[in-house]
Amino acid sequence: MRQERRLYSLLGLLLLLAVVYLTWFPTTHDGGGGGGGGWVKLPVPWLQPRMPFAARRGTHFVDADTGSPLYVNGWNSYWLLPARSPALAAEMLRRGRRMGLSVCRTWAFSDGGPGALQISPGRFSEAVFQVLDYVIYEARRNHIRLILCLVNNLDNLGGKAQYVQWAQAAGANMTNSTDSFYSHPTIKRYYKDYVKAILTRRNSYSRIRYSDEPAIFAWELMNEPRCVSNSSGPYLQAWIAEMAAYVKSLDTNHLVTVGTEGFYGPGIAERLGVNPGEWAASLCSDFIQNSAVEHIDFASVHAYPDSWLPRASLEEKVRYLSNWVDSHLNDSEQILKKPVLFTEVGYLQHSDANSNSTVDRDIILRIVYDKIYDSARKLQAGSGALIWQLMVEGTHMYGDNFSVVARDRPSTYSLITNQSCRLQRLYGEGDPGWQCSIPP
């Protein structure tokens, strides 16, 4: 009888908890932008899986708790926030987990315009902020870490052009050039205010501050920073140093990277021949100089051989890509002495009937994967690659000519998953709930 009373008491307690959750954390409906339905808001940090921070030791990443090496197989889905669909974001993160992927790079910004996160300088949409909360919360539930980018060089979703427009509207004296983003005090203050709002945000689901959230792998200062005028290069370099130091002043838990494409500047003249063309040296980007900044923890590189070399044969693109990757691996290991991530690796999906895009993409991806795996075996600087970009059904409006629904491309799906397997077998790190099903 006493055992039955205890059982009834336990059942009553569980029922009470259920009523409290349904009362205080009701289903919240999708904010629009791509379907999705609703989701239940459960701010219970003790339900989150334990996850250590990612850290850096010399030229490679480590588990901050154990010191074990971390090598990344990841992907880009920039649209997780702008889609404003928790259901689609959750599905993408689940699919990433099924492939053994460990890091997703996505945008943590949406500046101005309809449905923006930052409506105007320092003014935010709480509803959109809660979408970002959910993305981070759901990433941790799936043992995925996020690289969160803080602003765009491009005009997409606002970018630095929106900051310039805001400053001009406020009466700031400046030219129309978006290069003002890197040097004008008003714009730099806007950016710092935004960074502070993001880093000090307390997640409405987990109640964990972003700066204390281990599911965040790193902060990226800008997506593909470039200048209009080559004379603005020193301003970009100073901006990187200032903003990296500012991020670190607010958050010592997380890694910081610039977000560069990896183009070489005039600092080391013999490297200019590694660029895809003379045009690349005129964009102010200088891979070595930008990445050498004290508070930058790792270098970033992009790889788009098809769009960078549109007239080249596949054989020429393969040869170029191999040299591009090798050069950045060697410079990161020997000069920078920092890890390097190939944070975007993409190949155009041609629509013509004679195109062999999937096969060509797999060839390009395999080159990068093999070089990363070889680096991982040697505990060297090549620390991972992230395909651009993965989608799920219902996100076509956020796609581009590089987008892939992986399960619709069996060869690509297998290639991505096999890379996850290879890296897991080396050091056994990553999602403890994911086991490779591909025989060695």
UniProtKB/Swiss-Prot annotation:
One of its GO terms (cellular component) is extracellular region. Pfam families: Cellulase (PF00150). GO terms for molecular function: mannan endo-1,4-beta-mannosidase activity. It comes from the Eukaryota. It is found in: Secreted. Keywords: Glycoprotein, Glycosidase, Hydrolase, Secreted, Signal. Its main location: secreted. Residues 1-22 form the signal peptide. InterPro entries: Glyco_hydro_5 (IPR001547), Glycoside_hydrolase_SF (IPR017853), MAN-like (IPR045053). The active site is at E224 (proton donor), E344 (nucleophile). Its EC number is 3.2.1.78. It is an enzyme of class 3 (hydrolase). Glycans are attached at N173, N176, N230, N330, N356, N401, N418. Expressed in stems and leaves, and at lower levels in roots and seeds. It catalyses: Random hydrolysis of (1->4)-beta-D-mannosidic linkages in mannans, galactomannans and glucomannans. Substrate binds at W107, N223, Y304, W388. PANTHER family: MANNAN ENDO-1,4-BETA-MANNOSIDASE 6, PTHR31451. Belongs to the glycosyl hydrolase 5 (cellulase A) family. This is Mannan endo-1,4-beta-mannosidase 6. The gene is MAN6.
